Design a protein with these regions (language model features):
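Short Gly/aromatic-enriched secondary-structure transition segments
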Residues: 26-38
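Catalytic-pocket segment enriched in acidic/His residues
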Residues: 46-184
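Short, basic and Ser/Thr-rich N-terminal targeting/leader segments
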Residues: 8-12, 33, 63, 79
Length: 184
């Protein structure tokens, strides 16, 4: 049970998969460490007071991706792809990977300064927040990334009330209103 969860959001993201172990990698060499790319949903539990991203983003079903990897050689320009998402067939997000705040080589270089990356590690590149909205039990999430394909995920379990959309500064309920969801 995650206390004080008011709403869950799913953010459509472009993610990359590491090909080999990486530590202290320069930006110039970083793309040599990329094996391929996957569609990725970054799910967040909103409404709780956060001390870190671990609890609101780190639940075991909160990072559905794949189910396939498109290899790096199939995507000559990872910064020129459209990312789209739908919830129950309703369009939610539509943005270009060219709008990413941090490029892949920058992300690999920065993360590898602080931790050892391993083959198969998946790093999501972030999202464009326009169109993000609540998700609930029974919903179907879809993500499509140009040249990578389209994936579908289903939400099961309990979820917060459908009538709440928490925004910063709003009053939060005194009691928890939701329990974890599972995305399959």
């Amino acid at each position: 049970n995650i206390p004080a969860v008011e709403v869950y959001h799913a953010e459509a993201e472009f993610a990359f998969v590491m090909s080999k172990q990486a530590k202290h990698v320069s930006e110039a060499d970083a793309m040599d460490y990329v094996f391929g790319y996957v569609p990725f949903f970054d799910v967040s539990a909103r409404g709780m007071i956060r001390r870190s991203q671990l609890i609101p983003k780190g639940q075991h079903t909160f990072s559905p991706c794949g189910p396939w990897i498109t290899t790096k050689d199939e995507i000559p320009d990872p910064y020129n792809l459209q990312v789209k998402s739908w919830v129950n067939g309703e369009a939610r997000q539509n943005y270009s990977t060219g709008d990413m705040g941090h490029k892949i080589d920058d992300q690999i270089s920065w993360v590898s300064k602080y931790q050892m990356l391993q083959p198969g590690d998946i790093i999501a590149t972030g999202t464009h927040h326009d169109g993000i909205g609540p998700i609930n039990v029974g919903d179907t999430l879809e993500i499509e990334i140009e040249k990578l394909g389209r994936a579908r995920f289903f939400i099961k379990g309990d979820s917060p009330r459908k009538d709440i959309e928490w925004l910063a500064g709003q009053n939060k309920p005194a009691q928890p209103v939701g329990t974890p969801i599972t995305i399959v």
